[in-house]
Amino acid sequence: MKKNLLFVGLLLALSLGVSAQSKEYNGFAFGFKVGPGFDWTGSTTGAAVNEGTKVGMNFGLAAEFYFAENYAIVSGVNINLNRGHYSFTDGVLDSLAHLKTYNVDRMYKGTVYEIPLMLKMVTNQFGDFPMRYFAQVGAGFGYASKVKVADAFDGVERPDVYGVTNKEFSNLRLALKAGIGAQYSIDETMRLFLAVNFSHDFVNNINSISPNYYRFYQGNKQIGEREVKLNLLQNRVGIEVGILF
């Protein structure tokens, strides 16, 4: 818990640091955002199969620096409560040291602390109505904390309690991000915004241990090594509602 708070504090300090440096350009905006996220799991190898879309949440701090009238650098701090549901094949040894495979149906959840870095392109205002539309594209750099899973096996029901598997899932998260939205100016210094963003991980979420490798040995020799790695990737469509000052 202390490590998580320290990490969030570091992200906040970085975000506020950008604020202090940007005010001299008189184009900085800072605010808050919140909204749901619709998550599903992908695999570039096909070894993991998506089993449906799960609903998570995201909230955080938003920071924008306008270096031109219609162009801004977007950053801040995102706290994403990710969810997922996928299945894969694992293996176990029987009494004769023969590898038997079985299906694992896995639901998982985790918290990802992320710093986005995006280019925002904004339209001009249309007429007298103070509404502008925008598109944004960039990347997200994140840290995954306390990923938990609940597994159902062939003939074994899923437990009610999620178990922590931090060593199995990588802490590193790197994602491509793109989105569209609209912002409404309340006055010269305050505006509301609504955005729909797509996020796609491009770094494997699974470490090179079980279940990327069957975890069973005969003597000192590992057997049943998985030929095709899971290569798990998180996808999300998120809706954000926020306010900027």
Kindly give the residue locations of the regions a language model identified.
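Sec-dependent signal peptide recognition
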Residues: 2-8
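Outer-membrane beta-barrel biogenesis signature
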Residues: 5, 15-31, 223-229
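Short glycine/proline- and aromatic-enriched beta-strand/turn motifs that initiate or cap beta-hairpins
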Residues: 21-62, 236, 242-245
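Gram-negative (and chloroplast) outer-membrane scaffold detector with strong preference
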Residues: 24-28, 65-153, 234-245
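Flexible, solvent-exposed loop segments that connect beta-strands
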Residues: 41-50, 83-110, 145-172, 206-230
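Transmembrane beta-barrel strand/turn architecture of Gram-negative outer membrane proteins
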Residues: 57-59, 115-119, 174-180, 184
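Predominantly the C-terminal beta-signal and adjacent terminal strand-loop region
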Residues: 173, 178, 183-245
